[in-house]
Design a protein with these regions (language model features):
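Conserved active-site-adjacent core of cysteine acyl-enzyme catalytic domains
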Residues: 19-29, 94, 99-216
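Active-site-adjacent structural segments surrounding the nucleophilic cysteine of cysteine proteases
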Residues: 1-116, 164
Length: 216
């Protein structure tokens, strides 16, 4: 009788364990729905514009924090940590050419092959010399309101290197594209969906910039 009681208790414990572990996870359908859901501002990951929607003349949102590649290696760290520059050039490349052959992974490979990130940070020369390898003409601009507004009004996208401040604690690259009559510009931040979702004043952005290049 005692043995039967012990066995009964063991079966109950095992059944309870299975139930508790199962309820803590997601079934495949629920998990799939979660991964396809919009990412809330402030999260540490974001999903890029699907490759099927990449086309010339439309600026895609491409994120270095996209789970598709964020943890792959680049410049002694990961794409998530170090690849804001290559990710920005990926966006501009897609916008200018409409080609779908270059993701941030491919752009990082191009950067490393040319030794453009020897210390973990992508060098400014990648925005001109590296871009030239892709058939893009990156022209460095003076850091003033006239230069930025003229380039954007002509339809040219801009890659900007920004100092620690609003967009970063260390150093960062962002894409600027589009400007309205109130001098509000579109920011395509490869590290933040929330910062990419709003418009920014020209002066507000200009105060953060260390260098910038337009792609005509």
């Amino acid at each position: 009788l005692a043995l039967c009681s012990i066995l009964t208790c063991l079966v109950f414990v095992l059944m309870s364990s299975c139930v508790s572990h199962g309820s803590a996870g997601l079934d495949p359908t629920a998990e799939d729905k979660l991964l396809k859901a919009p990412v809330a501002p402030g999260y540490s990951f974001a999903f890029s514009t699907p490759r099927s929607q990449w086309q010339a003349g439309t600026m895609p949102h491409i994120y270095q924090i996209d789970p598709a590649w964020s943890e792959l290696p680049y410049a002694g760290g990961t794409i998530r940590q170090n690849a804001c520059g290559p990710t920005c050039l990926t966006m501009v490349y897609i916008y200018k050419t409409g080609h779908t052959d270059m993701t941030p992974v491919d752009m990082c490979a191009l950067s490393e092959a040319g030794n453009y990130a020897p210390t973990g940070a992508t060098e400014w020369s990648f925005m001109t010399s590296g871009a030239w390898q892709l058939g893009l003409n990156g022209t460095e601009l003076h850091i003033d309101r006239s230069s930025i507004t003229q380039a954007l009004r002509s339809g040219a996208p801009i890659i900007a290197s920004v100092r620690p401040g609003t967009f970063t604690n260390v150093g960062h690259y962002i894409v600027l594209w589009g400007i309205d009559g109130a001098d509000q510009v579109g920011v395509y931040d490869p590290n933040s969906q929330s910062r990419s979702a709003r418009r920014w004043g020209v002066v507000e952005v200009l105060n953060e910039i260390e260098a910038m290049w337009a792609y005509y």
